[in-house]
């Protein structure tokens, strides 16, 4: 082993401070001089409305993949795109990158952006958001939050993550560096889980400023990040009739009395069939008699005459008679008192 090779191994085994800042080592034709053993191919379908655009840009697609010794085919009858390796292909992973490129193009990503995925330090992520929200109205509202007014929110996400983001249908297609793809996925998933994207955008902006200060490299940044509390806490619906809680007892509840037990207590258990039937008939007739009595009382209420009040003339005469009566004793006492005063 030469000195240069030993130096490279030493460098690779040293601890890394920031793994995201590391440059991905390039894969060269010298690393795989024998090429591929077998041909590999990937195909993807595209919607009808993309047919016209793909037909226009397909010569550029063929030219782009030919640089990496790949072949591209467009089938307008079946509505599919195919990428294949050739005998000259030396990069084993380039076919995966080409597959991602045609997937992005099928999802309305323009060719100028999709071809960037063929670079080593660029990746793509297709985030499925259709099954994250059950109600369609909520889904449309939260997806619109991700785009923002005039696409302002989406543009700010792109600037902070250095990724190209396209929201369409039930998916979000992201294209950019791997660190940015992680951030985009977090923002998208949290937005669909009813966390407004502005909170995550604000946190990313603060982190970007903190990264500029080398003194804070080994410190916890959570004290600088904003903490948002959910104000819309859904309260549990209270029942209309609340049952009073019974006092706790360590003993099990008493066993309910069975039908046989009730019959034994009343003595009905020892009666024969005819006696039981006679008792039931007696109870039934007693109930019928009681019901008939109540019915008669209710019917006879209409025939009871109302109580007549005394007429006004009678009242007046009785009042006059009461006033005409003179208390003789009181009058005598009054006269005697007056005579004494005179004397």
UniProtKB/Swiss-Prot annotation:
Lineage: Eukaryota, Metazoa, Ecdysozoa, Arthropoda, Hexapoda
Limits of the KH domain: 125-193
Bias-annotated ranges (Basic and acidic residues): 271-302
Function in brief: Required for 40S ribosome biogenesis. Involved in nucleolar processing of pre-18S ribosomal RNA and ribosome assembly. Binds to RNA. Required for female germline development, cell viability during eye development and for survival of dividing cells and epithelial cells during early wing disk development.
Pfam families linked: KH_KRR1_1st (PF17903), KH_KRR1_2nd (PF21800)
Similarity comment: family membership: Belongs to the KRR1 family.
Protein name: KRR1 small subunit processome component homolog
Quaternary structure (record): Monomer. Component of the ribosomal small subunit (SSU) processome.
GO biological process: rRNA processing
Keyword field: Coiled coil, Developmental protein, Nucleus, Ribonucleoprotein, Ribosome biogenesis, RNA-binding, rRNA processing
Gene Ontology MF annotations: RNA binding
């Amino acid at each position: 082993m030469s000195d240069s090779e030993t130096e490279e191994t030493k460098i690779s085994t040293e601890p890394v401070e920031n793994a995201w800042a590391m440059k991905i080592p390039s894969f060269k034709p010298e690393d795989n001089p024998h090429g591929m053993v077998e041909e590999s191919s990937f195909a993807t379908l595209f919607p009808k409305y993309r047919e016209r655009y793909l037909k226009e840009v397909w010569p550029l697609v063929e030219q782009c993949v030919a640089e990496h010794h790949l072949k591209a085919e467009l089938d307008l009858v079946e509505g599919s795109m195919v990428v294949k390796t050739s005998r000259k292909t030396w990069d084993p992973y380039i076919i995966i990158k080409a597959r991602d490129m045609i997937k992005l193009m099928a999802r309305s990503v323009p060719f100028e952006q999709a071809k960037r995925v063929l670079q080593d330090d660029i990746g793509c992520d297709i985030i499925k958001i259709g099954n994250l929200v059950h109600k369609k109205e909520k889904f449309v509202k939260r997806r619109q939050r991700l785009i923002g007014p005039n696409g302002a929110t989406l543009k700010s996400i792109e600037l902070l993550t250095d990724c190209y983001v396209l929201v369409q249908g039930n998916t979000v297609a992201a294209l950019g560096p791997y660190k940015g793809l992680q951030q985009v996925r977090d923002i998208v998933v949290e937005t669909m889980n009813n966390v407004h994207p502005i909170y995550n955008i604000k946190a990313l902006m603060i982190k970007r400023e903190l990264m500029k200060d080398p003194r804070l490299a080994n410190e916890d940044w959570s004290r600088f990040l904003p903490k948002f509390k959910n104000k819309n806490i859904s309260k549990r619906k209270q029942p209309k009739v609340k049952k009073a809680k019974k006092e706790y007892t360590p003993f099990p509840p008493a066993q309910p009395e069975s039908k046989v037990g009730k019959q034994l207590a009343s003595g009905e258990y020892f009666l024969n069939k005819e006696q039981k039937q006679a008792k039931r008939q007696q109870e039934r007739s007693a109930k019928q008699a009681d019901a008939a009595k109540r019915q008669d009382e209710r019917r006879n209420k209409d025939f009871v005459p109302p109580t007549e009040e005394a007429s006004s003339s009678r009242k007046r005469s009785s009042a006059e008679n009461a006033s005409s009566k003179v208390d003789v004793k009181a009058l005598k006492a009054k006269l005697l008192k007056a005579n004494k005063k005179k004397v």
